[in-house]
């Protein structure tokens, strides 16, 4: 940018220094175009359009540094500044300032302004700002001006300058063309005509009826033709002279002339929009981060807080004494408690086990129906073990952000590694450990991290992972395999002895009346778990407090039991005494009938297993509901089995038929229930396996039948399966008739105790093993 541009940007002000040489100022018509939509002509072109090419001014030597003038000289400077700068300061005011001795202030200000102007001229004249985008068009135009002035006889460079100049100021194109000091060609003439149209100067050459002016456009075109006739170019047409050469006038939209301007504006607006969107995104991200951080405040467990990723460690020192649980507080699940006591003993005295090569189990999975005491067992381990205890709920791992669950798993095990040996307890692990599904990617990440931490490439020595769940069937097989969860401990519903121990535990800190029979309450609450019994005692205590009693009586406990079993009484509904007695009798009848039927059903299985060669030994018999079964007889093999004989398979068929046959013998053929459907399903599958896969049928022979046999073969297989089942049914009926007294004795023992072990079953049936079969009269007496 030249010094001429600097002289136009700043208004001339007087200076105590000698003024530098400057180019003549352009005229107002060249500085400001007529049309408001045109871009303003760059400053170097204003003098160019009015005076033509000028030789480049030689730079003047920099003046010496200014010295502060004396008062009289300052007065002269002020007067000069007032005259040349067009200031509004009156002479009287200046004289007052001089008299007051403040003229040096004006002189100093003038010197500062002059120095600023010289500095600005120096910056603008250099290439310091040439990298700015808005400076590039001016540089291009300045380059075209220099080329055109250096080659005035080159029409191509003159036309290029006129074409570029037409984008900024068509008036300057007209003035430069009409100076006749440069060579032109047809393209230059076209740019000149375009400038006339843009500035509406073409109207001066058209006829005017009001003034009587004739058209001079043909003369203009003839003149333009003569200007280009001497150049090596295509012959210039003379339009408008005849019909064969008409004059084509194109109306140009003023908006089209600012195409480059609009392009620059679009780029500028795009950049502004991008910057605005970026700022909004940054501000939104900052606000979101601040909001997330606020979720993790004091007492919160938000995603943004560091405490949300740190595991919870049980500190017995700050816990109330009543909240610290031990194995003494766990009743009704002796088998599960015994296995967990071994783990605690291992943690307290590891040398006792390691001397024989024993290793600490990596994982313990507690399963069972709700309310059986799985979490209570974990609390007892936390109270008994002398090692750190970390705990998390399965639902605490996942949140709305992907990756949070895996990070919390890593944080949990990192904290556990620092304090090993320790125990990590995850309650309701099915929330994160369920079978992996394709559409649950975030849950899979959490489960994968848990699998790696439990048994991955890096070994976690000294960390025992405990977990509790009510739904073990939906857990991922990779999680429940040995090496991750080595022990699966089932916490069942308590039996009669367990319920009695639980009731005594909950009643020990309460005043109890002497008429309360804990054993009777335990026998009258079959199917109750620990949570139900705790609720029973609590309801009875509230009832006693409402009635104002000093002690818990049997009436309050009976009321609580009835409320849990039958619900709240509807006292608003009137029922007669006869209806009450009938309903109570029916309820007791159905309950007792169901229990008696279940007891005989399970006793039938047990008696057949005891008296059939090849059957597995009995482990336990119970009439407590287990899953979908009302009762169960479990059998365990005495040793590992690699192959099974036909005798053993037939014994299994007989055991499956024992329950249905017992129901038919005791209650009659018409009173057989659907409780044996699972037994029949198992027996049918076993018989079909013997016939189709093992070749244990004389009618079919030693043949392995494929999955889809022919119709004839399938009918023969079905007939043989039915034959095996009927033969087993007949054998079992004869056996139970022979040992019917054992059946009655075992059923009565189950009704009394609900659960019997193998030794207890043998003690019950042993006195009746050698006695003969009962007569019909004795059978009726036994039933009564």
From Swiss-Prot:
- Organism domain of life: Eukaryota
Which EC number applies? 3.4.24.-
UniProt-recorded Gene Ontology molecular function terms:
ATP binding; ATP hydrolysis activity; ATP-dependent peptidase activity; metal ion binding; metalloendopeptidase activity
The protein's UniProt keywords, in alphabetical order, are: ATP-binding, Chloroplast, Hydrolase, Membrane, Metal-binding, Metalloprotease, Mitochondrion, Nucleotide-binding, Plastid, Protease, Thylakoid, Transit peptide, Transmembrane, Transmembrane helix, Zinc
Q: Where is the transit peptide?
A: 1-47
One BP annotation, GO: protein import into chloroplast stroma
Q: List the disulfide bonds.
A: none
Q: Which InterPro entries match?
A: AAA+_ATPase, AAA_lid_3, ATPase_AAA_core, ATPase_AAA_CS, FtsH, P-loop_NTPase, Peptidase_M41, Peptidase_M41-like
**SUPFAM superfamilies (alphabetical):** FtsH protease domain-like, P-loop containing nucleoside triphosphate hydrolases
CDD domains tied to this protein = RecA-like_FtsH
> Binding of Zn(2+): at which residues?
601, 605, 679
Where are the active-site residues found? 602
Q: Which GO terms describe its cellular component?
A: chloroplast; chloroplast thylakoid membrane; mitochondrial membrane
- Cofactor(s) the protein requires to work: Zn(2+)
Give the way it sits in the membrane: Multi-pass membrane protein
Cofactor detail note: Binds 1 zinc ion per subunit.
List residues binding ATP: 368-375
Query: Where is the protein found, in the record's own terms?
Result: Mitochondrion membrane; Plastid, Chloroplast thylakoid membrane
Sequence segments annotated as region (Disordered): 1-71
Bias (Low complexity):
1-12, 24-34, 42-53
Role of this protein: Probable ATP-dependent zinc metallopeptidase.
Q: What is this protein called?
A: ATP-dependent zinc metalloprotease FTSH 9, chloroplastic/mitochondrial
């Amino acid at each position: 940018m030249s010094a001429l541009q600097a002289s136009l940007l700043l208004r001339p002000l007087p200076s105590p220094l000698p003024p530098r040489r400057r180019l003549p100022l352009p005229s107002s018509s060249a500085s400001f175009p007529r049309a408001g939509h045109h871009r303003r002509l760059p400053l170097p072109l204003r003098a160019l359009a009015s005076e033509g090419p000028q030789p480049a001014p030689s730079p003047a030597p920099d003046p010496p540094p200014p010295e502060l003038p004396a008062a009289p000289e300052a007065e002269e400077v002020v007067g000069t500044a007032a005259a040349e700068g067009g200031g509004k300061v009156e002479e009287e005011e200046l004289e007052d300032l001089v008299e007051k001795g403040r003229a040096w202030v004006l002189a100093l200000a003038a010197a500062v302004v002059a120095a600023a102007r010289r500095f600005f001229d120096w910056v603008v004249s250099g290439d310091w700002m040439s990298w700015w985008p808005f400076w590039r068009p001016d540089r291009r135009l300045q380059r075209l001006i220099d080329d055109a002035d250096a080659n005035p006889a080159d029409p191509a460079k003159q036309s290029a300058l006129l074409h570029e100049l037409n984008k900024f100021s068509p008036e300057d194109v007209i003035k430069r063309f009409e100076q006749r000091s440069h060579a032109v060609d047809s393209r230059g003439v076209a740019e000149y005509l375009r400038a006339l149209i843009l500035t509406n100067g073409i109207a001066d050459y058209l006829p005017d009826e009001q003034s009587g002016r004739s058209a001079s456009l043909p003369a203009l075109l003839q003149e333009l033709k003569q200007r280009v006739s001497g150049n090596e170019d295509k012959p210039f047409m003379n339009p408008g002279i005849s019909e064969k050469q008409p004059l084509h006038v194109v109306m140009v939209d003023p908006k089209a002339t600012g195409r480059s301007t609009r392009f620059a504006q679009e780029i500028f607006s795009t950049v502004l929009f991008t910057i605005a969107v970026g700022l909004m995104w940054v501000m939104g991200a900052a606000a979101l981060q601040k909001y997330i951080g606020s979720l993790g405040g004091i007492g919160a467990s938000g995603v943004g807080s560091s405490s949300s990723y740190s595991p919870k460690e049980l500190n017995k020192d700050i816990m109330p004494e009543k909240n610290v649980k031990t194995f003494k507080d766990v009743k009704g699940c002796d088998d599960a408690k015994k296995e967990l006591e071994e783990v605690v003993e291992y943690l307290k005295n590891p040398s006792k086990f390691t001397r024989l090569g024993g290793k600490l189990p990596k994982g313990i999975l507690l399963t069972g129906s709700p309310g059986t005491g799985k979490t209570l067992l974990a609390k007892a381990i936390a109270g008994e073990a002398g090692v750190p205890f970390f705990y998390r709920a399965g639902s605490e791992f996942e949140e709305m952000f992907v990756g949070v669950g895996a990070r919390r798993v890593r944080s949990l095990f990192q904290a556990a590694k620092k304090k090993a040996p320790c125990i990590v307890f995850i309650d309701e692990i099915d929330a994160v450990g369920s079978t992996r599904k394709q559409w649950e990617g975030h849950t899979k990440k959490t489960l994968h991290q848990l699998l790696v931490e439990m048994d991955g490439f890096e070994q976690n020595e000294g960390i025992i992972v405990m977990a509790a769940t009510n739904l073990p069937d939906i857990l991922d097989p990779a999680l429940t395999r040995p090496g991750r969860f080595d022990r699966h401990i089932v916490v069942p519903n308590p039996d009669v002895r367990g319920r009695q121990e639980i009731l005594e535990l909950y009643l020990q800190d309460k005043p109890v009346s002497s008429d309360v029979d804990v054993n009777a309450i335990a026998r009258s609450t079959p199917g109750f778990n620990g949570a139900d019994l705790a609720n029973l005692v609590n309801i009875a205590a509230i009832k006693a407090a409402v009635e104002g009693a000093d002690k818990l009586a049997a009436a309050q406990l009976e009321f609580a039991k009835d409320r849990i079993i039958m619900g709240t009484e509807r006292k608003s509904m009137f029922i007669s005494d006869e209806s009450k007695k009938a309903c109570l009798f029916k309820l007791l009848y159905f309950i007792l009938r169901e229990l008696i039927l279940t007891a005989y059903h399970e006793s039938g299985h047990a008696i057949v297993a005891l008296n059939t060669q090849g059957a597995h030994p009995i482990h336990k018999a119970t009439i407590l509901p287990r899953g979908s079964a009302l009762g169960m007889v479990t059998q365990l093999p005495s040793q590992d089995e690699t192959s099974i004989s036909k005798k053993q398979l037939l014994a299994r068929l007989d055991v499956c038929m024992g329950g249905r046959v017992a129901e038919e013998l005791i209650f009659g053929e018409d009173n057989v229930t659907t409780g044996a459907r699972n037994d029949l399903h198992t027996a049918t599958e076993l018989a079909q396996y013997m016939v189709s896969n093992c070749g244990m049928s004389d009618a079919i022979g030693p043949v392995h039948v494929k999955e889809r046999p022919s119709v004839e073969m399938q009918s023969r297989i079905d007939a043989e399966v039915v034959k095996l089942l009927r033969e087993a049914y007949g054998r079992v009926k004869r056996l139970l008739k022979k040992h019917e007294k054992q059946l009655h004795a075992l059923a009565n023992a189950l009704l009394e105790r609900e659960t019997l072990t193998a030794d207890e079953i043998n003690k019950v049936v042993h006195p009746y093993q050698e006695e003969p079969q009962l007569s019909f009269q004795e059978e009726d007496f036994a039933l009564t």
